[in-house]
């Protein structure tokens, strides 16, 4: 399964961003992991890399939170009776990713991968609102990250 990704760079500084292939690999791993328990067809999604101003605006508009955030997920809502391979949109804020990676003392690639996987799982219907959901989602993220050769992103919390 190779997802079709519309990668949009809306950040003033695009240096140091992961490649389209890296994003595709990370999404593919999340989808492949999920496909073991469900039937996911060929999937299309948009990944938009933004600056803090756009992240802040979207976070305020859609979540009522007056600050920028690292990743926003907007699942595509398919009308009943229509089958489309559209999964949704991920909005990832470049500056927040860089700040968090520095604060957490992790590689940029690891943090980009984690947030891409985290957002993709949200598009697949996972959430972390309650403790049980959070444990399930974080467990999946940890497994996928380790399959990709990265450290468990929640290791410090365990």
Curated annotation (Swiss-Prot):
It is found in: Cytoplasm. It comes from the Bacteria. Binds 1 zinc ion. GO terms for biological process: rRNA processing. Keywords: Cytoplasm, Endonuclease, Hydrolase, Metal-binding, Nuclease, Ribosome biogenesis, rRNA processing, Zinc. InterPro entries: MetalPrtase_cat_dom_sf_prd, YbeY, YbeY_CS. Its cofactor is Zn(2+). Zn(2+) binds at residues 118, 122, 128. Gene3D superfamilies: Metalloproteases ('zincins'), catalytic domain. GO terms for cellular component: cytoplasm. One of its GO terms (molecular function) is zinc ion binding. Its main location: cytoplasm. Its EC number is 3.1.-.-. Belongs to the endoribonuclease YbeY family. Single strand-specific metallo-endoribonuclease involved in late-stage 70S ribosome quality control and in maturation of the 3' terminus of the 16S rRNA. This is Endoribonuclease YbeY. It comes from Haemophilus ducreyi (strain 35000HP / ATCC 700724).
């Amino acid at each position: 399964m190779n997802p079709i990704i519309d990668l949009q760079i809306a950040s003033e500084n695009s240096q140091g961003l992961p490649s389209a292939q890296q994003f595709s690999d990370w999404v593919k791993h999340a989808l492949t992991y999920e496909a073991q328990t469900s039937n996911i067809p060929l999937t299309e999604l948009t990944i938009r890399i933004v600056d803090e101003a756009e992240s802040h605006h979207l976070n305020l508009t859609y979540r009522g939170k007056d600050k920028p955030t690292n990743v926003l997920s907007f699942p595509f809502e398919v009308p009943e009776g229509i089958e489309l391979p559209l999964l949704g949109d991920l909005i990832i804020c470049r500056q927040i990713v860089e700040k968090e990676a520095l604060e957490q003392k992790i590689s940029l690639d690891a943090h980009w991968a984690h947030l891409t996987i985290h957002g993709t799982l949200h598009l697949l219907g996972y959430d972390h609102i309650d403790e049980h959901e959070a444990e399930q989602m974080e467990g999946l993220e940890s497994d996928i990250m380790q399959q990709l050769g990265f450290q468990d992103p929640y290791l410090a919390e365990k």
